[in-house]
């Protein structure tokens, strides 16, 4: 797609400042992201959380404008909890992703500057990638943000749909660390979330230390 004028500026804002990774395997989904927040070329915060949870079994990764991301996160939680208290019952991961895509598409002329991965486990593992225009794709593996070209190279080379959830978590960690080494807007460490049928587990990694 050719991006012109203001759209190019928006794309640059979304790409600049983070690396997030999502991987889907048979027994779950892994979401991972670095911890650095940038303001231009300035490191604004070294310990930002970019992996968030809607429920114990549904998570998201975030890239883009912090204010817009906070609003979108609230929207996603409200979508889930509203459905839960109505006759329709809990909404599926695909349903949440589709609702968010509709919101983003409806506001594309005054867009929220975000790129979101939504992943989790309902009756099966699901992983969706959404951009600020509301485009939505279901993925087996994906990387977003300024370090995504580096991270995606690692994923392309090593992803195997038959790998275990632990192997996928290790791959996601290494993909983000590869971006940290080559992308100045990605840094500090990595949060890795393993989401499966019973809930989620979260690990934090730093260059020379596991927390």
From Swiss-Prot:
GO terms for molecular function: threonine-type endopeptidase activity. It holds the Pfam family Proteasome. SUPFAM superfamilies: N-terminal nucleophile aminohydrolases (Ntn hydrolases). Its EC number is 3.4.25.1. It is found in: Cytoplasm. Residues 1-17 form a propeptide. GO terms for biological process: proteasomal protein catabolic process. It catalyses: Cleavage of peptide bonds with very broad specificity. Its main location: cytoplasm. The 20S proteasome core is composed of 14 alpha and 14 beta subunits that assemble into four stacked heptameric rings, resulting in a barrel-shaped structure. The two inner rings, each composed of seven catalytic beta subunits, are sandwiched by two outer rings, each composed of seven alpha subunits. The catalytic chamber with the active sites is on the inside of the barrel. Has a gated structure, the ends of the cylinder being occluded by the N-termini of the alpha-subunits. Is capped at one or both ends by the proteasome regulatory ATPase, PAN. Component of the proteasome core, a large protease complex with broad specificity involved in protein degradation. This is Proteasome subunit beta 1. It comes from Saccharolobus islandicus (strain L.S.2.15 / Lassen #1). The gene is psmB1.
